[in-house]
Amino acid sequence: MKGGKRVQPARPNRINKEIRATEVRLTGVDGEQIGIVSLNEALEKAEEAGVDLVEISPNAEPPVCRIMDYGKFLYEKSKSTKEQKKKQKVIQVKEIKFRPGTDDGDYQVKLRNLIRFLEDGDKAKITLRFRGREMAHQQIGMEVLNRVRKDLCEDSDLAVVESFPTRIEGRQMIMVLAPKKRQ
């Protein structure tokens, strides 16, 4: 639609003339309680201070309003939500694939990568794939998984086993390790 009017997004808080109550519980600029006053008196006080009257909790009886700079309030609110998002760590599941015949050199490289994943706080999924005639030697695959478990959980105390395969699923065995919580 060309040339149409842009709809303003609804504000989460009503301000100044948008407040519909006749009486409000007023809080000052510094957070001090002023008490229950009429809406006109509250608007006058906000105008004297050169800031806005913002309805904080509209469902209260009477509604709670605060005298504050609304633009600054929105900025602080968005800043704090961004800060909270930044602090949240998304735990990823990283996968390393082994084969029953994985050589020692390759095993060490994959083990180093697993250690790095666990130190970064990510979970590690170890997939052991069987091809062709390897299916007849599933005990070799279990030995590889037990070796990984011994190296990471028992010897270095880096991880805890979240799930350990008891049998083969399709043509693979899957073990999941989670990083150990540090005190």
From Swiss-Prot:
Keyword Nucleus: no
Chain coiled-coil ranges: none
One example GO MF annotation: translation initiation factor activity
Record key words, sorted: Cytoplasm, Initiation factor, Protein biosynthesis
UniProt GO BP: ribosome disassembly
Record family assignment: Belongs to the IF-3 family.
Subunit structure of this chain's protein: Monomer.
Described purpose of this protein according to its UniProt entry: IF-3 binds to the 30S ribosomal subunit and shifts the equilibrium between 70S ribosomes and their 50S and 30S subunits in favor of the free subunits, thus enhancing the availability of 30S subunits on which protein synthesis initiation begins.
Protein name: Translation initiation factor IF-3
Encoding gene per record: infC
